[in-house]
From Swiss-Prot:
Pfam families: AMP-binding. It comes from Mycolicibacterium smegmatis (strain ATCC 700084 / mc(2)155). Reversibly inactivated by post-translational acetylation by Pat in a cAMP-dependent manner and reactivated by Sir2 deacylase. Gene3D superfamilies: 3.30.300.30, N-terminal domain of ligase-like. GO terms for cellular component: plasma membrane. PROSITE patterns: AMP_BINDING (PS00455). Belongs to the ATP-dependent AMP-binding enzyme family. This is Medium/long-chain-fatty-acid--[acyl-carrier-protein] ligase MbtM.
Length: 526
């Protein structure tokens, strides 16, 4: 038993609180005491022990059995890797092949899934053992499972962009994950009376951390599938009302969407909410402030708004404000070749316990005037051991995040990114991976594809693919690009723009000018 499995066991077996899970078909919530969830997790841990798996893959919705599968892997001392399910527009066979290959490539040997996801995965030829989590986790236990030595070194294998924008897997040890959970709990002031409510995907570090915080804290949490929010976004606010949640978390786009259309809301009571984390993507000041103002008529305290900073390499949280501070804004002047302009940026709080932040000065200051801008570097107890397949990160070593920022008395401010990531709905997406996949489509010119994020601070940021194309069937090729990217990357492009050969802007050395492509696309959209 490692420190994380011991903490989970102690909390779940002594807690009187519940895990409350949303059932999409009936649109009802179902309570499961943490003690019962622990028994289900023991069943999963036992099966993993029989398989001898040091790394376990999870695919599916956050059913009680799905949650038990995650916790069971952690109880067994195995590393858990969670991947997205099938998304709209994806080819089922391509998705299943891609998912199983991704698991195999990071050392996963046992997979847990359920329902249609399970059925599709089992149609593919794979050496991985694939279990039905509903079957394994639902079995009755007559004895308490005696946990032996951990089956592996790591607790979480988290997909990430890395500091260079290259797809990587962060390897997180049990002590690092637990340190992050405890540091976050201390900053938030987590108490036994707190109630969480989340629809965040568990394959995202923010969603997984929100769930594990409740499990380790033994507190009540309400967990809905991301698909339930996507199909009816205003459900989130009604879930907060029904649960009397004190804690929630979401990416910027969710706060912007609800705030923009809040006039549609009725019968809402958010007076219990004391901490609403905003993370995973750049913070839109106006949209976030509007959420606080508009929802205050339903009892929401704008002081609960908590823009924060984190990344998978640090388990999740790095800087988080103290509850009650609310949205803090720093106004800056930015100079470019076109002149000067002012921008308002969110202050993201100070480092949680065990973590440190510093700035590494460089040439890239993002044009910010009167601020000491540098690349954000972090270190501390929550840090990963390193990326899979690469040299380990030495304890105490400063890790360059690729983000540009500066420090104020109220905390960290992020003003730009060195790494060319695309952020959609809180997810970091890798341009090179999308471009490689799109280039497989007949007629699309290899090496002449650019994937960019557009309107990143808007309510609905999107992924746009621009490619040079030559062929008779543009419509068919466009559909195939969407299908392939959806299947293998788990995100549906907002648009695919085909251009004549030679149209994409390049540098004198022949490199594609991504920022110029992004600017042209945004201008063309008006």
């Amino acid at each position: 038993m490692n420190v994380l499995s011991a903490a989970l066991t102690e909390a779940m077996t002594t807690s009187s609180a519940d895990l409350v899970v949303f059932e999409p078909e009936t649109r009802t919530w179902h309570r499961h005491p943490w003690g019962q969830v622990h028994l289900r997790a023991q069943n999963v841990a036992e099966r993993i022990g029989q398989d001898g798996s040091s790394a376990v893959g999870i695919v599916g919705e956050p059913t009680v059995e799905g949650v038990a599968a995650i916790l069971g892997a952690l109880l067994a001392g195995s590393a858990v890797s969670i991947l997205p399910g099938l998304v709209r527009g994806a080819d089922p066979d391509q998705w299943a092949d891609s998912t199983l290959n991704r698991f195999a490539n990071i050392g996963v040997t046992t997979v847990f899934s359920h329902g249609s996801y399970l059925e599709q995965l089992r149609t593919r030829d794979s050496s991985l053992v694939i279990h039905d989590d509903a079957e394994v986790a639902h079995a009755q236990r007559s004895t308490t499972l005696e946990l032996g030595a951990p089956l592996g070194e790591f607790a979480v294998l988290q997909g990430t962009a890395g500091s260079t924008g290259t797809p990587r897997t962060a390897q997180l040890r049990p002590d690092a994950v637990l340190a992050n959970l405890r540091g976050l709990a201390e900053r938030v002031g987590l108490a036994g009376s707190d109630i969480g409510c989340s629809w965040l995907p568990l394959y995202h570090d923010m969603g997984l951390t929100f769930l594990l915080s409740a499990a380790v804290g033994g507190t009540e949490t309400w967990q809905a599938p991301t698909t339930a929010f996507a199909s009816a976004p205003f459900s989130w606010v009604h879930w907060l009302t029904e649960s009397r949640a004190t804690l929630t978390a979401a990416p910027n786009m969710a706060y912007g969407l609800i705030g923009k259309y809040s006039r549609r809301l009725t019968d809402v009571d958010l007076s219990a909410m004391r901490f609403a984390l905003n993370g995973g993507e750049p913070v839109d000041i106006d949209g976030t402030a509007r959420f606080g103002t508009e929802l205050s008529r339903f009892g929401f305290d704008p002081g609960a708004l908590s823009p924060s900073y984190g990344l998978a390499e640090s388990s999740c949280a790095v800087t988080v404000p103290v509850p009650g501070v609310g949205l803090k804004v720093d106004e800056i002047t930015v100079t470019t070749e076109a002149g000067s302009s002012t921008q308002k940026l969110a202050v993201l709080g100070h480092a949680i316990a065990g973590m440190e932040v510093r700035l590494q000065p460089g040439d890239e200051d993002a044009g910010v005037v009167d601020r000491e801008v540098g690349e954000v570097e972090i270190r501390g107890t929550s840090m990963m051991s390193g990326y899979r397949g690469e040299a380990p990160l030495d304890p105490g070593e400063w890790f360059p995040t690729g983000d540009l920022g500066y420090l104020t008395d109220d905390g960290l401010v992020i003003c730009g990114r060195k790494k060319e990531l695309i952020t959609v709905a809180g997810r970091n997406i890798f341009p090179t991976e999308i471009e490689r996949i799109a280039a497989r489509v007949k007629g699309v010119r290899e090496g002449a594809v650019v994937a960019v994020g557009t309107n990143e601070r808007a309510v609905r940021p999107g992924l746009v693919i621009a490619a040079e194309f030559r062929g008779p069937d543009e419509a068919g090729a466009r559909s195939e690009v969407v299908q392939r990217v959806a299947s293998e990357c788990g995100v549906v492009p907002a648009d695919v723009v085909f251009l004549a050969p030679g149209s994409l802007p390049r540098t004198s050395s022949g490199k594609l000018r991504r920022l110029e492509v992004k600017r042209q696309l945004e201008e063309s959209k008006g």
